[in-house]
UniProtKB/Swiss-Prot annotation:
Annotated source species: Campylobacter jejuni subsp. jejuni serotype O:23/36 (strain 81-176)
Subunit structure, interactors included: Homodimer.
This protein's name: Glutamate-1-semialdehyde 2,1-aminomutase
Cofactor annotation: pyridoxal 5'-phosphate
Gene responsible for this protein: hemL
Family that this chain belongs to: Belongs to the class-III pyridoxal-phosphate-dependent aminotransferase family. HemL subfamily.
Length: 424
């Protein structure tokens, strides 16, 4: 069966033919590749084509596809049982592994997805502060729970409307939206709203393309939260163990009240978490009145994969330095080639994460990102795919370097970039 036929058949039985919208390739006016298998830095589609994979399952695969250590850990766990709905030693082992490196985090709770982690963190913040409103930032994605599917309305200092059908206005009105990297927009919202339970932010935004928050912006944001008895939530579902071993904390050293984790923490299996100090976490059921639960939360397969992934990352002290150098080489190379061709391009990296925008101006927030030339991106994406390079099929996604990549792979990629730019 070909990719084209597979997608046509999938559309008959699966809504939209995919189980997550961006996979449909609609943003690049194309159709998805159906993947048969992956190995290291490569994936292979059912037509027999191979690609250097910079999506890496949208971030979890720090060690690439089919890592032997993670596979071995999963196989060992599977032989004992895939799920029990009861505590296991693996849960405590992974909890200790995560918490040992964050002095401000004392307890953790595992869930099965990033959406669950952020949704639960917000409920926890509301329960702890006894306040109703939440503040998020335009362009930051925190999963698809109702209160977070809200984008900016007519100005950041207003109540906002849902950005998805099915989200009630009564839910959306409790979500305030500020401008990323703009502390004045935050101050304005706090001046007009005294019942903000929490501020949730991607300290390294990866869902409007890669846009890191500025150090002084985060520092001032933390002060505002502290002065207003508002909890600060860092959503590190993507950046945790990706931007550095300690995520944004390893870079900006700012201690958020709650951190959400995901992707790498599950080693490629469905796992996520939220963590905080004990006084906050202890109001979760069964100790307190904030309810959160999950049938597959902390399942042994995901815990085993997470332990193997984080243990390996922690042991390989030079890993993040290597990944950062490769990401730097890639983004600087792309920028140089674009300049030579006279194409508008902004490119950056943070650790093993990288992003690029087809725009002439620097990008520091969502409105800047929206100025990107989407038609140009679509042509570039198609050309790269034809040259064996698998990039995220959206201008507003982040790319990832894995440990199985090397200078040769980056050189191959840059040659594909050169050829792709020639054809634009």
């Amino acid at each position: 069966m070909t990719n084209k036929k597979a997608f046509k058949e999938a559309c008959k039985f699966i809504a939209g033919g995919v189980n997550s919208p961006v996979r449909a390739f609609a943003n690049v006016q194309s159709e998805p590749k159906f993947i048969s298998h992956g190995k290291g830095a490569y994936i292979f589609d059912i037509d027999g084509n191979s690609y250097i994979d910079y999506v890496q399952s949208w971030g979890p695969l720090l060690f690439g596809h089919c890592d032997k250590d993670i596979q071995k850990a999963c196989q060992k766990a599977l032989h004992k049982g895939s799920s029990f709905g009861a505590p296991t030693l693996l849960e405590t082992e992974l909890a200790k592994l995560v918490l040992s490196d964050f002095p401000h985090l004392e307890k953790i709770r595992f869930v099965s997805s990033g959406t669950e982690a952020t949704m639960s963190a917000i409920r926890l913040a509301r329960g702890f502060t006894k306040k109703d409103k939440i503040l998020k930032f335009e362009g930051c994605y925190h999963g698809h729970s109702d209160s977070l599917l809200v984008s900016a309305g007519s100005g950041a200092a207003t109540f906002n409307s849902p950005s998805s059908l099915g989200v009630l206005e009564d839910v959306a009105k409790h979500t305030l939206v500020a401008k990323y990297n703009d502390i004045n927009s935050v101050k304005e919202l706090f001046e007009k709203n005294k019942d903000i339970a929490c501020v949730i932010i991607e300290p390294i935004a990866g869902n409007m393309g890669l846009v890191p928050a500025k150090q002084d912006f985060l520092e001032e944001l933390a002060k505002i939260c502290k002065n207003n008895q508002t909890l600060l939530i860092f959503d590190e579902v993507m950046s945790g163990y990706r931007a550095s071993y300690l995520g944004s904390y390893g870079i900006n050293h700012i201690q958020a009240d709650i951190i959400t984790f995901g992707k790498v923490i599950g080693g490629g299996l469905p796992a996520a978490a939220f963590a905080s100090r004990a006084e906050i976490m202890d109001i979760l059921s069964p100790l307190g009145g904030v309810y959160q639960a999950g049938t597959l939360s902390g399942n042994p397969l995901a815990m085993a994969a997470g332990i193997a992934s984080l243990t390996k990352a922690k042991k390989k002290t030079k890993l993040y330095n290597k990944l950062g150098k490769l990401a730097k080489k890639l983004t600087q190379g792309m920028k140089k080639l674009a300049d030579e061709k006279g194409l508008p391009l902004q490119a950056c990296h943070v650790g093993s994460m990288f992003g690029y925008f087809f725009t002439k101006d620097p990008v520091s927030n969502y409105q800047d990102a929206l100025k990107s030339d989407l038609a140009l991106f679509s042509k570039f994406h198609k050309n790269m795919l034809e040259n064996g390079i698998y990039l995220a099929p959206s201008q507003f996604e982040t790319g990832f370097i894995c440990s199985k990549m090397d200078d040769k792979i980056i050189d191959t990629t840059l040659e594909a970039v050169r050829e792709s730019f020639k054809r634009i």
